Each structure stands twice: as C-alpha cells, then as structure tokens.
Amino acid sequence: MPFRIANVWEMTGDDKADIKFGKMPDKIQKKMLRTSLRKAGKLLQTAARGMVAKDSGALRASIKPKAAKRSRKNKHIIAVRVMTSSKAYKGEYFPGGHVEYGTQFQSANPFMRPAADQVRSQVIAYFKQDLKAAIAESGKGK
C-alpha cells in the first residue's frame, strides 16, 4: 500500500442535530455526510493547492478531497481526507511525500500540514453548518 499524505480530523456534533440525524435511514445519513464532507474538504484542497510549489502543476492537480468511511463501532466519528492522488507515484518516487517531508538530497517544503493548520476551524465550521442545513432541509420535506 503506497504512502499517502493525509490529514484526518475527528470531531463531535451538535446533540439536537445528532438526534434528528440518528433517526434517519443509514443511506440518507451516508449521503448527507459524504456530501458535506466533500464540500468542507474543498476548503482544505484550495489551501493546500495554494501552498504547493507550482513547477509542473501535476502535484497541485493531484490534491483531492475524499470522505472517509465511518467506523462500524462508532458511527458518530467521520473524517475527510485531502490527499495526493496515487497517480502521482512514479515508480519509487512519490513527489507529494518528497516535497512535504523532504529527502536526504532535498529539503522539506511542507504544504499539506500548514494548509490544514490554516483552515482547520473554517473546515469544521463549514461542515457543521452544511450538515445542519441538510438535516433541516430533509425535515421540511416531510
């Protein structure tokens, strides 16, 4: 399994929204979570793309958000990952990892961690707002 640069955050939600959300069918929960996570992940994607070196643009283009799967043990823990694509691998060479962490010949030029630190609170706030809006919208349809 290739190494991927990723930032995974865990957070807890609002109790009232959690109760409404828990009463919904699993399929609807999953769809709402993934949609809200992807939207929130785009904030981190934009920040990371802005901080990465612009040489060929391939590394910048490979940075994409992905909604991680929920844990079966605790369905209340969800995650969004923004990572470089596996298409960026070139044999033994992984440009994302080499740029972020450096090598023995190249100094590190971090872009993913600083981007995550910069927009963390915005991503969490946006996700909570978007998910609450989706829950409220689904309640109006009944």
Task: Identify the meaning behind each predicted range.
Residues 90-91:
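Carboxylate-rich helix-loop segments that flank metal/cofactor sites and access channels
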Residues 1-79, 83, 87, 96-142:
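Short, Lys/Arg-rich flexible segments
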